[in-house]
């Protein structure tokens, strides 16, 4: 017989690191070319004028300017699009 109580085992105890997703530059903010605007999984926000899309769906500014969000009708649902209006 055992003199000590055996330790139990568990299948829990794991968690993934936060990925820091979300909007990084809001409407009306001034950004420089290359600035990250939104980190996202999938294209919940579509790239518009002067906005590029990375391979992980990150949206970034192609030129210096001011961030502007707009809502567009795409099929049966409304989508958001982000544009950069260039500053002179």
From Swiss-Prot:
Belongs to the bacterial ribosomal protein bL27 family. Keywords: Ribonucleoprotein, Ribosomal protein. One of its GO terms (cellular component) is cytosolic large ribosomal subunit. Residues 1-24 are annotated as: Disordered. The lineage of its organism: Bacteria, Bacillati, Cyanobacteriota, Cyanophyceae, Synechococcales. It holds the Pfam family Ribosomal_L27. GO terms for biological process: translation. One of its GO terms (molecular function) is structural constituent of ribosome. HAMAP family: Ribosomal_bL27. This is Large ribosomal subunit protein bL27. PROSITE patterns: RIBOSOMAL_L27 (PS00831).
């Amino acid at each position: 017989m055992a003199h000590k109580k055996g330790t139990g085992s568990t299948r829990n105890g794991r968690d993934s690191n936060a990925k820091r997703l979300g909007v990084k530059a809001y409407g009306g903010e001034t950004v420089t070319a290359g600035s990250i605007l939104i980190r996202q999984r999938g294209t919940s926000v579509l790239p518009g004028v002067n906005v590029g899309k990375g391979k992980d769906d990150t949206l970034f500014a192609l030129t210096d300017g001011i961030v502007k969000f707009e809502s567009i009708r795409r099929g049966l649902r409304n989508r958001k699009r982000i544009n950069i209006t260039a500053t002179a």
